[in-house]
From Swiss-Prot:
Enzyme Commission number: 3.1.1.4
Post-translational modification: Contains 7 disulfide bonds.
Name recorded for this polypeptide: Basic phospholipase A2 CB2
Functional note: Snake venom phospholipase A2 (PLA2) that shows presynaptic neurotoxicity. PLA2 catalyzes the calcium-dependent hydrolysis of the 2-acyl groups in 3-sn-phosphoglycerides.
Catalytic activity: a 1,2-diacyl-sn-glycero-3-phosphocholine + H2O = a 1-acyl-sn-glycero-3-phosphocholine + a fatty acid + H(+)
A biological process term (GO) from this entry: lipid catabolic process
Keyword list, A-Z: Calcium, Disulfide bond, Hydrolase, Lipid degradation, Lipid metabolism, Metal-binding, Neurotoxin, Presynaptic neurotoxin, Secreted, Toxin
Organism whose genome encodes this protein: Crotalus mitchellii mitchellii (San Lucan speckled rattlesnake)
Molecular function via GO: metal ion binding; phospholipase A2 activity; toxin activity
Compartmental location: Secreted
Tissue expression notes: Expressed by the venom gland.
GO cellular component: extracellular region
Top enzyme category: hydrolase
UniProt keyword Ligase present: no
């Protein structure tokens, strides 16, 4: 779902400090 994808983005951003969707 879109909501879960949004949570995944925020989680990845927090974990890696660089948003994985920036690539």
């Amino acid at each position: 779902s879109l909501l879960q994808f949004n949570k995944m983005i925020k989680f990845e951003t927090r974990k890696n400090a660089i948003p994985f969707y920036a690539f």
